[in-house]
Structures are given as C-alpha cells and as structure tokens.
Amino acid sequence: MKRNEIVIDGRLLKRGTLRHTPAGIPALNLLIGHKSIQIEAGGRREARCEVEAVAIGDLAVRLSTQKLNQPLQLSGFLTRHSVKDGRLVLHVVGVEPIGNGTE
C-alpha cells in the first residue's frame, strides 16, 4: 500500500511558535478545525473535527504569519506523531486560501 493523500478544508485554529529541527529546518505545529456536511449511506451527516498538523520548511515560515480562523485548503499526508506516540498528524505539503474568509 502506498496511497496516503489528504485534502481537507478547514480553519487555522492554533499555531505554535516557529521552531527549527535539529537539522535547522523550520517547523510549525498547527491545529486545523474542519466542519462540513457529508453524505453517508444516503443521508446527510455533519462532520466536525480538529486535526493536529505540522508544516516543515518554507511552508512553516509562510504559515507562521497566517491569520487565525482563515479558511484554507490543506493537502498532505498522515503519519504518527512520534515513534512512541501513535496519534495521527497531518504533515502539510500544500496550502491554498479559500474564498474571502466568509464561508
């Protein structure tokens, strides 16, 4: 199995302090809030979640100044938080603004 691609619309709820990895690469922890209506088994279902995410490199620097609560489309892949912590984390590899922030 190779496929591990996530695209999600959400809002930047929290942003950590820009830090650097031991290799000197910028890194930024994020919390993304998502809310939508999805179709499941022919019915409408409200989907809500908060997703832990991390951005690395130039994207981390760019997101370190992103205004909170702005609608964004994020793309990336899922992996575990660390060797000892199995929580899922979205590693963001792409970000695009959505609309004018009124959605």
Model segments located where?
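Single-stranded nucleic acid-binding surfaces, predominantly the OB-fold ssDNA-binding core
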Residues: M1-E103
